[in-house]
Amino acid sequence: MDKFVITGGVPLKGTIPTNGSKNSALPALAAALLTAEPVTLHRVPRVRDIRTMERLLVDIGTTVDVEGETVRLRTERIVSPEAPYELVKTMRASSLVLGPLVARSGRARVSLPGGCAIGARPINLHIFGLEQLGAKINQTHGYIEAVAPDGLRGAVVHFDRITVTGTEDLMMAAVLAKGETLLRNAAREPEVVDLAELLIKMGAKIEGAGTSTIRIQGVESLGGAVHAIIADRIEAGTFLVAGAITGGDLTVTDCIPEHVGALVSKLQQAGVDVTQPSETTVRVRGTGRLRSVDMTTEEYPGFATDLQAQYMALMTQAEGIAVVIENIFENRFMHAQELARMGANIRIDGRQAIVAGPRELTGAGVIASDLRASASLVLGALVARGETVIDRVYHIDRGYEKIEAKLAGVGAKIRRVE
């Protein structure tokens, strides 16, 4: 298994680019199942979860052609409407094929999703929504089996809690359903809007994406489309924290500043100089001692749960006490123990973490437990005295493309070893 070896203490300086969004590309790839026509996606990051989804689509019957960051897909027919455990055990986004498969072929058999072990990610919201649209669903032997031999029909679906993948899955199912579907308490994330824009290009009738109520008028069939994936706001945010925690001068390019607005606000409150040189760039400059600032994760446009671990690493270097509250997922503080091995003072109390700083971090051997936790360990290592070895970096490869090369390009002393 690969490891990262990082020697800290170097302020990051220069320009670092942002890739397309993994969390936007995954549902866009799944959307190709909804049509027999070609779908071309640009700016698709070459990360592990994407490659897993592409292999799954090939198994289902999609022709997948990859050329750099462009992926061309065509699903002339559904050969096997199944997502087997062997393929999807490492990826929670496997549930995104459930809606498209039932909508297009009338049946689906999807293994319960894997991915990060960060508590309950309730697929029951997907199941409830599909049942409202008329699907018959059984859960057996770790699989969800759904059938709708007469097709899906429009309905009002009210989500008990906001769910991004659930909103995306139901939106894809509803575009081919008979009649009108209303999704209430829908997720407002930029990735949901990006998927809606792709589906509209394919011929879907969708209104309200980006609000809490999405209206979908079903159509007989969808056509092909060409679409560019939006910038990855989580990768951009990770790099902004990297610049701030090292006291550097880092410009993050090819991003959408509005999508990292909640993080930028917290960075500014903490004493970081943040500017926006252009519509697609954000610059961070360290100004000396950081101030502790409390933070609570929320659905968009609030502070993203996927940036909570990175923010916690930053707060280990801030003056005072910061309370970090995790409202989205349970059991998402596994990085705290590893940061503590490096010298951080963090106390966990249920859904909140109390971070006292500043503490000098020192290099240590640490283990990545999930995708975003691994990013926080990289950030801690960048500011730590001495050498840090991070094991199980396959977690970070699920969502970041060549992060070590990007960070090395702005001065970080980081290398990958087998």
Swiss-Prot record:
The keyword Cell cycle applies. One of its GO terms (biological process) is peptidoglycan biosynthetic process. One of its GO terms (molecular function) is UDP-N-acetylglucosamine 1-carboxyvinyltransferase activity. Pathway: Cell wall biogenesis; peptidoglycan biosynthesis. UDP-N-acetyl-alpha-D-glucosamine binds at R92, D306, I328. It catalyses: phosphoenolpyruvate + UDP-N-acetyl-alpha-D-glucosamine = UDP-N-acetyl-3-O-(1-carboxyvinyl)-alpha-D-glucosamine + phosphate. Keywords: Cell cycle, Cell division, Cell shape, Cell wall biogenesis/degradation, Cytoplasm, Peptidoglycan synthesis, Pyruvate, Transferase. The active site is at C116. One of its GO terms (cellular component) is cytoplasm. Cell wall formation. Adds enolpyruvyl to UDP-N-acetylglucosamine. Belongs to the EPSP synthase family. MurA subfamily. This is UDP-N-acetylglucosamine 1-carboxyvinyltransferase. The lineage of its organism: Bacteria, Pseudomonadati, Acidobacteriota, Terriglobia, Bryobacterales. The gene is murA.
